[in-house]
């Protein structure tokens, strides 16, 4: 996951999947979002200031950051998530960056000392540059990437992954009126402008060979789980990927992102047998992946979790 709602929630679920208690996908157990007072993820209220009421882990200063990262590593997370920029829907503009460079440096330093991945919510220009300069591998959003940020990413493109979360932006702008987020409201928030900027940023990153991943911010009412394949359609229709490029973003790049580059992401000898069988050709129509009725089989590590139908009768076939 990108981040979790409680300190050990992802760890407990990951462990239950890995020991066979429950069925689930491979994923990196994440920390809560690490944020600052008043930042994205600080959901405490004046009358309920206790940390237990916050969605994120709230820190202020380098030493609080160090202690926070060490505690998450003690709990057994695989990755740390830090909110480097704002989020307009919470009242802090997406272009705003709230952490100091020292706080970011300590976060990455401690995470790397424990061998953990670091991911960042980074919409603002400054936050994108900090991800590259400080060594944060997984960059969520990267909407407002200027030329300097693009140059930095291109020069370090084998060290970073960008997950723009386009479906969240698109649905927030155009398909969330039921939840009070009308196009008029989201335009005032700045999301329509950000969507335009994000599409242009992703087009530029694709031209420069920067690895772009699907996923991110699914689980909202207007971006429900199980609709993740919509990202691949947007990659093709909006940022110019070929269907093959979009498929590679969802398969081949997942391995190195999860530090399992030699084990997953490909169907070949030596890799784990994680296979999706589709009734259709996504190279001809990438949207076929969104039709759940056409998912014939789901296999993880050689075990079917949805087995393909087996014909009990069929026409005779003769071999010469």
Where are these regions (language model features)?
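Histidine/acidic-residue-rich catalytic or RNA/ligand-binding cores of hydrolases
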Residues: 10, 39-40, 90-92, 128-134, ...
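C-terminal cap of metal-dependent C-N hydrolases
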Residues: 250-252, 269-316
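Divalent-metal coordination cores built from histidine and acidic residues
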Residues: 1-110, 151-185
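Structural recognition of alpha->loop->beta junctions
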Residues: 129-149, 234-245
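Glycine-enriched alpha-helix->loop->beta-strand junction motifs that scaffold or abut catalytic
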Residues: 132-138, 156-161, 180-186, 207-211
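His/Asp/Glu-enriched, well-ordered alpha-helical/loop segment
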Residues: 113, 178, 183-186, 194-281
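Short beta-strand/loop segments at the ligand-binding rim of alpha/beta enzyme cores
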Residues: 107-119
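Divalent metal-coordination and catalytic microenvironments
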Residues: 27, 76, 80, 111, ...
């Amino acid at each position: 996951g990108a981040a979790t709602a409680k300190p050990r929630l992802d760890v407990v679920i990951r462990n239950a999947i890995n020991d066979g208690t429950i069925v689930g996908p491979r994923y990196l157990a994440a920390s809560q979002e690490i944020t600052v007072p008043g930042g994205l993820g600080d959901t405490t209220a004046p009358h309920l200031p206790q940390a237990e009421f916050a969605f994120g882990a709230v820190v202020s200063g380098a030493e609080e950051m160090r202690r926070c990262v060490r505690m998450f590593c003690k709990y057994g997370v695989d990755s740390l998530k830090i909110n480097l920029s704002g989020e307009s829907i919470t009242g802090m503009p997406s272009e705003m960056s709230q952490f100091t460079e020292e706080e970011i440096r300590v976060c990455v330093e401690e995470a790397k000392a424990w061998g953990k991945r670091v991911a960042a919510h980074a919409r603002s220009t400054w936050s994108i540059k900090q991800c590259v300069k400080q060594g944060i591998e997984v960059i969520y959003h990267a909407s407002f990437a200027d030329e300097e940020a693009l140059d930095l990413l291109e020069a370090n493109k084998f060290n970073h992954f960008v997950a723009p979360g386009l479906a969240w932006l698109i649905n927030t702008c155009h398909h969330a009126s039921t939840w009070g987020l009308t196009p008029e409201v989201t335009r005032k928030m700045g999301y329509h402008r950000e969507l335009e900027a994000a599409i242009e940023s992703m087009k530029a990153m694709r031209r420069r060979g920067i690895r772009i991943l699907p996923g991110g911010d699914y689980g909202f009412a207007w971006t429900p789980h199980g609709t993740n394949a919509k990202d691949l359609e947007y990659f093709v229709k909006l940022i110019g990927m070929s269907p093959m490029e979009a498929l590679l973003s969802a398969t081949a790049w997942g391995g190195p992102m999860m530090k399992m580059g030699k084990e997953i992401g490909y169907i070949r000898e030596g890799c784990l047998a994680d296979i999706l069988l589709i009734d259709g050709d996504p190279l001809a129509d990438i949207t076929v992946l969104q039709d759940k009725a056409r998912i014939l089989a789901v296999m993880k590590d050689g075990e079917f979790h949805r087995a393909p139908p087996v014909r009990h009768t069929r026409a005779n076939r003769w071999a010469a």
